[in-house]
From Swiss-Prot:
It comes from Mus musculus. It is found in: Membrane. Ubiquitously expressed. This is Suppressor of tumorigenicity 7 protein-like. Disulfide bonds: none annotated.
Length: 559
């Protein structure tokens, strides 16, 4: 979510003080009739309770309440201590089972089962209504819901990881060693959709090899995809997308992947030049040029990543810079994040600052790589001399204040990253797709950038001393933000789909235990204690039970 949108909304709110604030449902002041109706609707439950008490008091004589209470008291006085032991023991067992179920449901779904059932089923039966006064079909309500839905969808947008690993040379080798699958089906399905978007077009039927590859990208079974790629190469030895698939999924080393990508580059450049010559003939040829451009950019980018992994970092930087100059419209691929990581490896901090000056703009989307790299550069100037004792005694210098503010900005954007940088949580292989501001983005960033933070002396120490201060600045992160939009509430669900099951997903903000978990825990403990005391001291507990029943009877008789 861009900072520009945030400041634009703030400017509009300041410039139009009498206009309703979007998303909050604020409008013109209500009349006395509307306020009376709203007050009666809110006090309905209280009125019903008072009416019930009045009716009970009026019918106390016809219903012979005193006689009934006397009979109940006599019945309770005749019960033996064994009955109370059995009763409290059964109550403790039932409440314990409810407590265990509530705890399991909360950890799995993040909400209370009793609370959810109460809101979904019991509240409508008891006459509960929505707090909004607008009619469901009113234009204001529809516009508000449309705005909220659009904001929710933009928050939960999944992005392709610009530093994603190779399936054959990295992900599969991890599976061979550990026996664990690092990618989820949801993540791989998103990659299949990306491949169909990047590598296919409506003119594929004109070339048999492209028709075969179109089916290959839709195939879920990796051996079947690899087999289809070889079939496409038999039909056309210059099928670039077939080499791409083999480099991604069949190659078991980065060296093999680079060799296949170089073959794909030769074939892709031939097809790209041919498409450039025919692009103005028809809309179909323009679509074919866009597809061939995507293929060429993808191949060059992966070649740059191969060079980076093989230690030829300057070569990787050159390829990335050439890509960004030759294809500037393709900024949505976030090639600048690959460039930032490679420049940090070269310790070319001036070049890193130049890239940040271009992409850390108020009108451009942010990412953890941009925010935390900006914080790292400001931390680098003061981290070697930073001391918590000196800062506490003399205060922070201007440079230290700037570094701390940059850390707070980065932590507000993605609060999950510090735990991985400080090695408070173990890292896993990053997924192929990430959710910005989520745990998946934090893993992807820390996996590649942890070494850069360790290289700068004192950087992690300054981060450890200051990052938690962000949460004091934003006490209610889901309701309001400081420099960015409020933290989205959908990240946990999306991250659970993107990350493997053996990883414990980081959740922000930490969810408080629901009331019913505390209630059932207290009920279970108290009834178990009563059962134990009744079993150990039956006479004393019998006297206590009779005293409670007598007090209850006295209260009813007084009424």
């Amino acid at each position: 979510m861009a900072d520009g949108d945030y400041f634009a909304e703030a400017a509009r709110a300041v410039g139009c003080p009498h206009a309703p604030v979007p998303g909050l449902g604020l409008g013109p002041p209500l009349g006395w009739k509307e306020r009376l109706k709203a007050g009666l609707a809110n006090s309905g439950s209280t009125l019903w309770f008072l009416a019930g008490l009045g009716l009970l008091y009026a019918l106390r004589v016809p219903l012979r309440l005193c006689d009934n209470v006397t009979a109940v008291t006599g019945f309770l006085s005749s019960l033996t201590p064994k009955f109370y032991v059995a009763l409290t023991g059964t109550s403790s067992l039932i409440s314990g089972l409810i407590f265990i179920f509530e705890w399991w449901y909360f950890h799995k779904h993040g909400t209370s089962f009793i609370e959810q059932v109460s809101i979904s089923h019991l509240r409508p039966l008891m006459g509960g209504t929505e707090s909004s006064i607008s009619e469901p079909g009113s234009p204001a309500n529809s516009r508000e819901s449309e705005t909220l839905r659009h904001h929710h969808l933009s928050e939960c947008k999944v992005w392709r990881n610009p530093l994603n690993l190779f399936r054959g040379a990295e992900y599969r080798r991890y599976t061979w060693v550990t026996g664990k699958e690092p990618l989820t089906y949801y993540d791989m399905n998103l990659s299949a959709q990306d491949h169909q978007t990047f590598f296919t077009c409506e003119t594929d039927f004109l070339r048999p090899s492209d028709t075969v590859m179109q089916k290959a990208w839709r195939e879920r079974n990796p051996p079947a995809r690899i087999k289809a790629a070889y079939q496409a190469l038999e039909l056309n030895n210059d099928c670039a997308t077939a080499y791409v698939l083999l480099a991604e999924e069949e190659a078991t080393t980065i060296v093999d992947a680079e060799r296949l990508f170089k073959q794909a580059l030769r074939a892709g450049e031939i097809i790209y030049r041919r498409s450039q010559q025919c692009q103005h003939q028809s809309p179909q040829h323009e679509a074919q040029l866009r597809r061939d451009t995507n293929v060429l950019v993808y191949i060059k980018r992966r070649l740059a990543m191969c060079a980076r992994k093989l230690g030829r970092i300057r070569e990787a930087v050159k390829i990335m810079r050439d890509l960004m100059k030759e294809f500037p419209p393709l900024t949505m691929l976030n090639i600048h994040e690959n460039l930032l990581e490679s420049l940090l490896e070269l310790q070319a901090y001036a070049d890193v600052q130049a890239v940040l000056a271009k992409y850390d703009d108020i009108s451009l989307p942010k990412s953890a790589a941009i925010c935390y790299t900006a914080a790292l550069l400001k931390t680098r100037t003061v981290s070697d001399k930073f001391s918590p004792e000196t800062a506490f005694r003399k205060g922070l210098s201007t440079a230290e204040i700037n570094a701390v503010e940059a850390i707070h900005r980065a932590v507000e954007f993605n609060p999950h990253v510090p735990k991985y940088l400080l090695e408070m949580k173990s890292l896993i292989l990053p997924p192929e797709h990430i959710l910005k501001r989520g745990d998946s983005e934090a893993i992807a960033y820390a996996f590649f950038h942890l070494q850069h933070w360790k290289r700068i002396e004192g950087a992690l120490n300054l981060l450890q001393c200051t990052w938690e201060g962000t949460f004091r600045m934003i006490p209610y992160p889901l309701e309001k933000g400081h420099l960015f939009y409020p933290y989205p509430s959908c990240t946990e669900t999306a991250d659970r789909e993107l990350l493997p099951t053996f990883h414990h997903v980081s959740v922000y903000p930490k969810k408080e235990l629901p009331f019913f978990i505390h209630f059932t825990a207290g009920l279970c403990s108290s009834t178990a204690m009563l059962a134990f005391l009744t079993h150990q001291f039956p006479e004393v507990m019998g006297v206590f039970a009779k005293a409670v029943s007598m007090i209850s009877r006295t209260c009813v008789e007084y009424l």
